Amino acid sequence: FFVPSEISGGMQKRAGLARAMALDPEILFFDEPSAGLDPISSKLLDDLILSLRDNLNATIVMVTHELASIFAIGSNSVFLDPESKTMIAEGDPKKLLKTSQDERVIKFLSRSKKK
């Protein structure tokens, strides 16, 4: 038996997912789910989120800045312009990386230094 303060951040996140699963949701919302996790734990969490999506047949809505998660989980991503607070692109991130005409989207997805 553990109290929340005694378990790792990754275990706390998995416990949160277990609580959400108990409700058999149609939509799961995640806000920066891998924040504070090491890359291996982040990948495991991404895999768990994908498994939940498939097993629960649930829609996933996720806010993240993690490129690995965007490409692993995102089949339809929305990109927002922080200055105008408007949507600047929407679609599969892998396709947007190749086809977007918006340099901000390309820069974000490639993390390039181009201007």
PLM segments and residue spans:
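H-loop/switch region of ABC-family ATPase nucleotide-binding domains
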Residues: 64-65
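Catalytic Walker B motif of ABC-type/P-loop ATPase nucleotide-binding domains
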Residues: 28-31
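Helical segment within the ABC ATPase nucleotide-binding domain
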Residues: 43-55
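Helix N-cap at the start of a conserved alpha-helix in ABC-type nucleotide-binding domains
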Residues: 39-41
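Conserved ABC ATPase signature
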Residues: 3-7, 11
